[in-house]
């Protein structure tokens, strides 16, 4: 099957860091990127740049400490992992699953030397294109639809075997697109998506695993999800009412339904 997993971001760099692997001649750069979209929302995706020659990595790091604007071309990477949280009552440790998501740059970020601001690039600052298969049950309510997409990775990251080169980002659609997604899509549907990468902080709750404690642990989670602006229905979709829905760009009004991330999360 054809592959598409591409991200183009323009924003202001913050919190850069450099790490080295023992015995390797290359380094990894990581940083956050403050991206302003045309709906005035600011997102903070995490970005990684692998395989940077050590001297070049330190040169870039010194530039990034000044918080410049930069252009990043990359792919969305998702990794299943876990994190440990501590119970405030008994001090016991509990492992919770997480889907770690970030953007992996496919080249060295282009650091802008001019005195630009995020608003100068709001129209073109955040663009995502994905081709993949719906791999979870759809959750839909009030014109908002949420699902995960299984995307074949075309860019090799590390020594990952070919049969494991998949990413599964969360997809969220609103308005007429959300309604049409709910009607046409089911697990196994293949779609081509254009949209923007959104980040939001959510407070999660989990019960302590200590059998002598019934406490609840509250912990923060940073979510990355793709907000669709257009969906093309390619295969295994319900085409029974072709043309019934008004397919349009939902990016301008998709945040009018929920005034805050907490309100949006409450529907699930």
Predicted regions and their residues:
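Generic short beta-strand segments
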Residues: 16, 30-34, 74-82, 150-154, ...
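A general sequence property marking short-to-moderate contiguous segments
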Residues: 103-105
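Acidic, gly/ser/pro-rich intrinsically disordered tails
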Residues: 1-6, 17-27, 37-40, 55-62, ...
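Cys/His-enriched microdomains
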Residues: 85
């Amino acid at each position: 099957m054809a592959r598409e997993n591409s991200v183009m971001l323009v924003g202001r760099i913050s919190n850069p860091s450099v790490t080295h692997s023992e015995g390797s001649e290359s380094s990894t750069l990581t940083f956050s990127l403050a991206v302003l979209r045309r709906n005035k929302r600011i997102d903070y995706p995490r970005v990684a740049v692998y395989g940077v020659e050590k001297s070049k990595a330190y040169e870039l790091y010194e530039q990034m400490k000044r918080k410049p604007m930069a252009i990043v071309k990359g792919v969305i990477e998702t990794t299943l992992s876990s994190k440990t949280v501590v119970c405030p009552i008994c001090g016991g440790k509990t492992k919770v699953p997480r889907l770690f998501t970030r953007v992996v740059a496919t080249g060295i970020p282009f650091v802008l030397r001019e005195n630009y601001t995020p608003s100068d690039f709001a129209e073109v600052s955040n663009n995502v294109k994905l081709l993949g298969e719906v791999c979870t049950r759809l959750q839909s309510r009030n014109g908002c639809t949420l699902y995960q997409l299984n995307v074949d990775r075309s860019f090799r990251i590390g020594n990952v075997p070919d049969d494991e080169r998949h990413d599964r980002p969360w997809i969220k659609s609103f308005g007429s697109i959300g309604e049409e997604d709910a009607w046409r899509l089911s697990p196994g549907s293949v779609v081509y998506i254009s949209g923007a990468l959104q980040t939001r902080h959510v407070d999660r709750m989990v019960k302590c695993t200590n059998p002598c404690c019934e406490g609840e642990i509250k912990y923060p989670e940073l979510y990355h999800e793709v907000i669709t602006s257009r969906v093309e229905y390619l295969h295994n979709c319900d085409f029974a009412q072709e043309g019934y829905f008004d397919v349009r760009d939902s990016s301008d009004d998709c945040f009018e339904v929920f005034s805050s991330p907490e309100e949006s999360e409450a529907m699930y």
